[in-house]
């Protein structure tokens, strides 16, 4: 059985009941609700597209509202992100992320016929039980990335530098980067996109036979090939999403790609999006901690360029 089931624990139980004790098809005829076929695999590609599209449209809407309010004159020509104050940019992103999560909390259960966190496989208890190891993994990942960056020539300027112009802005981006961003990005990439791409891969590679269709309808596990394909594809997208933050440096993008692969592995290994979010938050927290120490608690931000 794959470590990554497309549904919750109840579905895994139903799947196991439909199989013999040695993992072979049971010869007993299904009776009653105990042998009910598993529910549909979620989140699939349609669900992921809705989530991503809603996020993008909401972000654009907020940008247009800011332009209409006159907070960013000329933004239509120069781009909102370049003209808004860092605090306004963070507020816009935080509002987009939190609103999307809130809307998803109520919307997707109507499609999935189960609670949002169950369909997403958030599974906080699994992450909590391994919190020490997950945080340690995130910190170790941060150390390795810091070592790797010593061999990367940094760009003269990066868009993210705009968030470190004042001490207040620096603390705001730290809070956002260690709490809000990791949770949202893990929900998006490891909660929606990872299973969606894997489900699509398995469906497209499914033999068009009655036996294969029956197996698809009565199981919810994903094949290793599908998980590997999805982990690579989502990691490419993850790196590209952060490309502007690292000035599109190929070496830095490769580092981000590797980080995403580790997060995907954690997600699959633990079966918990909360677990990968914990690793992600610990990693981001370590990166910010290095800067905090370097700048004396953000009191000497000029040291970042030295």
Residue ranges and their predicted role:
Residues 1-122, 127-128, 150, 282-306:
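N-terminal, membrane-interfacial amphipathic/helix-forming hydrophobic leader that caps
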Residues 104-109, 145, 149, 177, ...:
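Structural signal for membrane-spanning alpha-helices in multi-pass inner-membrane proteins
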Residues 69-90, 112-184, 199-221, 225, ...:
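Juxtamembrane helix-loop-helix connectors linking adjacent transmembrane helices
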Residues 94-99, 167, 171, 175, ...:
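Membrane-embedded alpha-helical segments of multi-pass membrane proteins
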Residues 48-49, 90-91, 131-136, 171-175, ...:
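Hydrophobic alpha-helical transmembrane segments
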Residues 61-64, 232-306:
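Functionally important transmembrane alpha-helices
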Residues 191-202, 288-294:
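Membrane-interfacial alpha-helical segments at the cytosolic side of multi-pass membrane proteins
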Residues 105, 191, 195, 261-264:
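Transmembrane alpha-helix boundary and packing residues in multipass membrane permease domains
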